[in-house]
Design a protein with these regions (language model features):
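A structural signal for beta-strand boundary/capping segments at domain termini and interdomain linkers
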Residues: 232, 293-297
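Active-site groove signature of glycoside hydrolases
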Residues: 2-33, 56-67
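C-terminal edge beta-strand
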Residues: 297-305
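Substrate-binding clefts and catalytic carboxylate motifs of secreted carbohydrate-active enzymes
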Residues: 95-250
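Exoplasmic/lumenal beta-rich domain surfaces
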Residues: 234-274
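Extracellular glycoside hydrolase catalytic/binding regions
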Residues: 37-145
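Exposed beta-strand face motif in extracellular beta-rich ectodomains
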Residues: 280-284
């Protein structure tokens, strides 16, 4: 319940504001009147209990009536917006849609799986960690630094390791704690100073031939990984079954199993892989790390041709 939570956390200095609902707009158009009345009623109650902290309501992007409904909610002070690929145009779209209240970019990161065109068997190509780091910078520059007086700040997603769609899509760290390039970018943007040692840089993987192969076929994939300081970079390759769950809604998922013995050659400039005999989608991952806690990732979707049998 909201009342006990407000009374409990009114005084701790770590509390910045009160978030009244996350992506609770209801209906595709975001105009469910019952939900918006409830949001405003709760916000009004919170303001009476704690007049020293502002209230915020978070919406998934800006579509439909979301801007108007937050603007009309008299007890809501701040519009929280979760935006990924759309962060580059967020400030412009917010103003054009009639947004007047200050906003917080409450979730941002690389383009979401739902925003990436899928290949011909339905698998989304994932940007490299280097490409994602560049996108974090652009998103922050456009949606936060590019909107002074309107944007109050932001929260990156996800500060940790997470299996969602793939083992590496959203996490800014690997499971062993190694930091990816996005951490270096945000460290610089937040502090004004880049880390003295940067994470490795990786180019998109290149499949020699076609990524759609016969069962048991061998496949060579090329890579290019460099260390900004010129140091040594260690690499490892893993072939995993594809999860196939691309719209998980944020729920935690187990990491798909590694195909043992699939990687025949593992080098910094590429890998030779023997694909499984079982038909279906797979994904080949490259992990690169330096000696200073930095890492880079890239992957490519692959397909073994044939009829995929569904377990009975």
């Amino acid at each position: 319940p909201a009342r006990p939570a407000v009374l409990r956390y009114t005084d701790p200095p770590a509390v910045l504001l009160w978030g009244i609902g996350n992506e609770r707009a209801g209906f595709e158009a975001g105009d469910n009147p019952a939900i918006w009345k409830a949001v405003n009623d709760v916000a009004a109650m919170v303001k009476k209990l704690d007049p020293n902290h502002p209230t915020m309501c978070v919406t998934a992007e800006l579509g439909g009536a979301r801007i108007a409904r937050v603007r009309e909610a008299s007890a809501i002070d701040i519009h929280g917006i979760n935006s990924y690929g759309g962060a580059l145009s967020l400030a412009e779209r917010y103003r054009a849609g009639g947004g007047t209240k200050p906003y917080v970019l409450t979730e941002f990161g690389p383009p979401g799986v739902w925003e990436i065109p899928k290949n011909d068997w339905g698998a989304p190509p994932e940007p490299t960690s280097t490409e994602k780091a560049a996108f974090y910078r652009r998103a922050y520059d456009e949606a936060v630094r590019g909107a002074p007086g309107l944007a109050l700040g932001s929260y990156v997603f996800a500060w940790g390791h997470k299996m969602e769609a793939t083992a590496t899509w959203y996490g800014m760290f690997l499971s062993d704690g190694a930091r990816l390039g996005a951490v270096d970018v945000m460290t610089e943007l937040w502090s004004g100073r880049a880390p003295s040692n940067l994470a490795p840089v990786v180019e998109p993987l290149v499949v020699q031939g076609t990524p759609r192969v016969d069962p048991g076929a061998e496949l060579r994939v090329l890579a290019q990984v460099t260390d900004p300081e010129g140091g040594a970079v260690r690499v490892r390759w893993e072939l995993r079954s594809e999860s196939g769950e691309y719209n998980t809604g944020g729920d935690a998922r187990p990491v798909p199993p590694t195909v043992e013995g699939a990687v025949l050659e593992s080098r910094g400039d590429g890998a030779l892989v023997r694909m499984p005999r079982d038909p279906g989608p797979y994904r080949l991952f490259l992990y690169a790390d330096d000696a200073d806690g930095g890492a880079a990732t890239a992957n490519v979707p692959l397909l073994v041709k044939g009829e995929v049998r569904t377990p009975m």
